[in-house]
Amino acid sequence: MGKKVTGACKENKVTEPVKRVYAFGKDAQGNNVTEGNTTMKATLGGKGANLAEMANIGLPVPPGFTISCQTCMEYANAGNVWPEGVLDTIHKYRLDLENRIGKKIGDAEDPLLVSVRSGAPMSMPGMMDTVLNLGLNDESINGLIRQTENPRFAWDSYRRFIQMFSNVVMGLDGDLFENAINAMKAVRGVKSDTDLTAEDLQELVAEFKGIFTENVSGEEYPALVVDGSVQFPQDPMVQLKLAIEAVFGSWNNPRAVLYRKKNKISDDLGTAVNVQCMVFGNKGNTSATGVAFTRNPANGAKEFYGDYLVNAQGEDVVAGIRNTSPIAELKHVEGLEEAGRELEEIFVLLEYHFHDMMDIEFTIEQGKLFMLQTRVGKRTAAAALHIAIDMEKEGLIDKKEAVRRVAPDQLDQLLHPQFDKNADYDVLARGLNASPGAAVGEAVFSSADAVAAAEAGRKCVLVRWETNPDDLAGMIAAEGILTSHGGKTSHAAVIARGMGAPCVCGVEALKIDAEKKQATVAGTDVVIKEGDMISLDGTSGIVVLGAVDLVMPELTGDLDTILEWADGFRKLGVRANADNPEDAKLSRDFGASGIGLCRTEHMFLGERKQIIQTFILNDDEAVREKAVGELFEAQTGDFYGMFKEMDGLPVIVRLLDPPLHEFLESPRALDVEIARLEATGGDKTLIAEKRMLMERIDGFAEQNPMLGLRGCRLGIVYPILPEMQVRAIATATAKLKKEGLDPKPEIMIPLVSTVAELEKLRAVAKKIIAEVAAEEGVELDIEVGTMIELPRAAVTADEIATQADFFSFGTNDLTQTTFGFSRDDVEAEFVPQYLQEHLLPYNPFATIDPGVAKLVEMGVKLGHEGNPDLVCGVCGEHGGDPDSIHTFNKIGLDYVSCSPYRVPVARLAAAQAALEEE
């Protein structure tokens, strides 16, 4: 059935006259009567504004008029009711257009045909609807035949119009019409639409009108009922009204809504509607249509790029019905030479005028060129870099504009493997694009199996309900991580981004049975078994059954050039979050000016986990001291490697932060193990030991561990732990100083809420640093600061700053504690619904929330009151988010810190933030 479109037109009272319709193009005397320009995108949409601009600079643009974006929103917000007077205004502009052209829409002698196209303020290619050849009916078809002396062209145009109108405006399934065309070709024994004769197409028109009558409801569209049955509308004004309503309605079609959400485009902008005289590329071999770019959008090369078709309409180029020809050949085609040369001249003119690479749609009608659209062309990351640099060299833009031209998030394309764009695959499921890049490997369902697969030389993808610290070895071994639970700041997402591993999280359709080592996908009969090849794309969040070919983007000097320019403009420093020398080196290679967060808890995993468990679970002080001694030796080596790799640059080491239960066995897993032993008649002594261990672990259980015994509280209750860590930091520093290096460690105390907590632990740290300095005979100047990740810490930052050399805002936990959210739960449970219902504008764990940002701003201001020399940074996941970086720049932070692979992104975003404030 067709989609709902208001039948009878109701009027909405408006007191103030508002201009809602704008003309573009020339009048009958050749004078430009355009009422807009390229600066009016918010009103005319991108397409309408640029049509007006092309008309203003004298390019051959078919005339027409544009209905404003605001009219679309008024119409939608009033429940699909037209604002008062708008239909009368449209009628006036339609009459004006007819006078300018000297033809009338629907005229039986010499009909004017128009297109009705969408055009939002922000480019949304292919997301909304278009209707072509509007104005054809059973009378005007005869006029078109007489004027063109080409019956086949006329009937083909009418056929196309009915098909497009039925699909776009009435919502009928396009296959109804394609099936009829295919049946006709089969009967005629031909393969291509172009092989059908005028008589065939006339027969199809009659059949198409029958399909329309059978599938459109007279109850929904009473105005279309004639003699008791629905008929294809013959009144051009009815056609036009319904088409405009359909384009307005397409603003809220599912694909457009999804596109806006993905690209952070407001839902309140609306789309303009462009009503434009049709020109035809299917009037014979001196007619053509095409789409082109003024430069190569794939690699940025300065060459004309695109395709055209002779004797075709615009949708044929993108529909793939016929093989296209490269745009460079157009000027060599007989009958099209002059138009081809003129087009290339226009390419140069458009670049000179807009100072950017432009995307163009054109039609040549019997040798005469017409420009149907121009807009800033979409391009790959590699092309964006190359074009920006070339245009700076050519004098079209300066270095500042070149830096502005590259979208920071685009750089992900250059740093990670991607699905081959030519690969053929079907999407099995979708989740959150948690960590960019693509991975292919056999599915494994446990960390141990991932390690085993990697050791055997087999690539694998770790598939889990959600990951935890126990899975680290498997995450490192796997090519990528796939989880059915968790959000963009879940354990899997954070660790994957830090490692530069592709990750797709929160695939709700994925039902994982870890014991059976398989997963099913809701809504399908697919079962993913251990060893099955799967592919995932962490950039887009898609999962594919089978192996998809991957490609690694080629890095060029263009990236270094743009980032070097960016560094000259940015105010924010950019550091990295790294926990090992390998990541530290990568961070430095990517241009990080230090390490903003070294998480020491990651150093307690793997083989060392048994040591920390011994400390936690054993009451014997001698045993515990021995365990701490082993940890000291291990940590000293860790810090030595980190500080050496970052020689001369700051490394902020966060003392142990997580609750102790994270280092212990899972009670659930232990309970399952005990049940298995009992069911299989296992060793009773072993069962008893497991039960004792269970009781001991239960003693560390907390109702809300993330707000319990962790961070600085852990250091106060178990002082031996921070003492050991500080001593290891100081010892590693002293050793490197003796070797002639310049280590610059800084100690960060986490989860402080009162100045008393920080004062106590700072005193402990300074005492141990002094002891090590005396023992080693070197001078140690190690700063001590804190993380501001609790609201109380932010609002008492002036007090806390008296005991701190620096603040690092932990915006992950600050967001949790400000909202009262449990991050790992809410991202999967209700944040998606909140986003859908506009209760949240975006995920606050991905982009900093204004309320949380106010706490950061307050913390910075108060902190400087307490300590004017205080250095302030941010080390949460927001540190790599371009939108958040703009906020942090305004607040006046000194640096942001992010995962190594986000460092180039942050450098560019920081420069753009600084330029935005100029």
Regions found by a protein language model. Give the residues of each.
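Conserved alpha/beta-domain cores
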Residues: 117-118, 555-558, 565-918
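Protease-associated
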Residues: 3, 396-477, 542-550, 559, ...
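A short, small-residue-rich loop immediately preceding and capping a beta-strand
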Residues: 479-485, 503, 873
